[in-house]
Structures are given as structure tokens and as C-alpha cells.
């Protein structure tokens, strides 16, 4: 009977699991492909069959979380853009913000290990600046929404620096939450209060 093939999906999954442990223990910089292969019981050749390099492997470890987060943000951003383009800038449905936040919180805690890898163990990898890239993505969207609302309320456009700071505040809220709160239900309560705070600040700037 032929021996088990090393180039199968089970081997890939096992490598990802072992890599996750190695990255959690040592961070991206300290982790070694040799150590990961030893834990997985495979050769480095088997690892390179699935992954180009250590960065590719790290991205694979955190990939599911990042894909889900991007999809939630894409759906929420699309909803808000449709609101603005349909002349409902003054009628924004705040409940959509709370729904999106609940989805984000659930994903952050479903993949909390992976989230913490990106936030605290990613130095030296292509994921190192992911929080900054999320701020940039949020910033572009917020600038569009803010301009539409300011026009609807006939008030001057909020300064770009302020919009950028608000974008940082939104991302920083989640970073603080996931790095300081262990329980998902407690995190959701925190996030809901955070959204109330952020919405109050937003409307305080654009409503006359």
C-alpha cells in the first residue's frame, strides 16, 4: 500500500496549524520555517510545495479573518454609499452601524488568535501595516460620507485632518477592544457604547 502523500490538503492544514502556534509563540520575525516543519513532521520541501515563503505562510494563517473582515466592510460601505447617492444623507440608518459592528466583533473573536497575530506579532511581515491600511480604507470612505452629509446639512466640509482622526478612532476602538477584552459578549457591549460615542461626535460636527 502506498504511503500517504505529503502534498495533500491535510498536510497543508497541519502546516498552517503548526505555523500558527510558532507565530503565536515567537512572532513573525522569530519564527522559523525549519521549526514549523519539525512541529508538522514534514520536510521544508513539503512546505515550499504549498507556500512561497514565510510571509506567504503567515498570510495564509490569518487569511480567513482578513477575507471576512473585508467582506463585512465592503457590504457596509456599499450600503452607506447607496444612502448618500439616493439623497438620504439626512436619514442615515444608524442601526446599520450597530449591525456591522456586531458582525465585526463576532469575526474578531471567532478569529481572535489570528487578529492578535496581525496586531502584535506581524512585525517584519506584509501584514505589519494592516491596521494603517484599514485606517486608509476607512478614511477614504469617511471623506465621501462626510462630504455628502455636510452638503445635505449645508455646513462647511469638515477638515481632512479631523476626518482622518475620526477614522483612526474607529479602528483604534476595535484594537483596544480585542487586545483588552477577552469575552465576546463583554466586547460587544463595549463596542455598542463606542459606536454611540463615535456617532455623537460625527453628528456633532456635521449637524448645524
Protein language model annotation of sequence segments:
Residues 1-8:
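N-terminal intrinsically disordered/low-complexity leader segments
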Residues 61-97:
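Amphipathic alpha-helical linker/stalk segments
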